Amino acid sequence: ASPSLAISGALAERYPKLLERLAQTPYEWLGHGWNMLCMHAGEVDAGTEAGWISDSRRALEQFTDQPIKGWLSPGRIQTANTPELLVKNGFTYHCDWVNDELPYTFKTTEGYMTCLPSCLELDDVFVLTQNLHSEDSFAQQVIDATDLLIKEGREQGGRLLALNLHPWLVGQPHRIRTVREILEALLVERGEAIWHAPPHSI
């Protein structure tokens, strides 16, 4: 598997020991804004938003030598300026939009950027806390989606399924079994049919 980590600038600033530990892993890091109060939404002016983006990137770069090329906005929310500001700050892809199962490149006024669409319908927060589905239902939904995308991939070319997990939610003792079941299904039972890719290589 190739997990990636969406990390906010405030988290890096507040918990440096955690970032030092994460820097010892091979996982790819994505910028995740400054914090969940600094939402890239509505009438936020471009200067303020640019500051959030650059500050969050610099906060992560203090702890890792890997280039921070990916972005996931807090709440997956963007302003009209977000894509351009991301390109201007050196990001090459974002995961904010939920409109496809295929990656695609688009043009901004600052250059090209790639979208790696997220699957909101399979986000653990969306399924468990908003739709109020059971943990078993969550696992089955992920497995069902994976099976269909494998079938489509064989017939029409590869598909993207990003599984977003939040440790504060699925890391609870009563949910760990569900995570293990999902990973068993994806990594072991269907492992040969899936490219477990880090985002930058897609």
Predicted regions and their residues:
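Metal-dependent polysaccharide deacetylase catalytic core of the NodB/CE4 family, i.e.
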Residues: 2-79, 111, 117-130, 162-167
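Alpha-helix N-cap and loop-to-helix initiation/capping positions
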Residues: 44-51, 133-137, 174-178
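Generic structural signal for well-ordered alpha-helices
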Residues: 16-20, 50-57, 83, 146-150, ...
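C-terminal domain-boundary segment and adjacent tail
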Residues: 93, 143-202
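Active-site-adjacent pocket scaffolds in enzyme catalytic domains
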Residues: 58-156
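Alpha-helical structural signal in soluble globular domains
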Residues: 21, 25, 59-63, 85-89, ...
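Conserved beta-strand termini and adjacent loop/short-helix elements that scaffold enzyme active sites
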Residues: 8, 32, 96, 197-199
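Short phosphate-binding/catalytic loops that engage adenosine nucleotides
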Residues: 1, 27, 91, 191
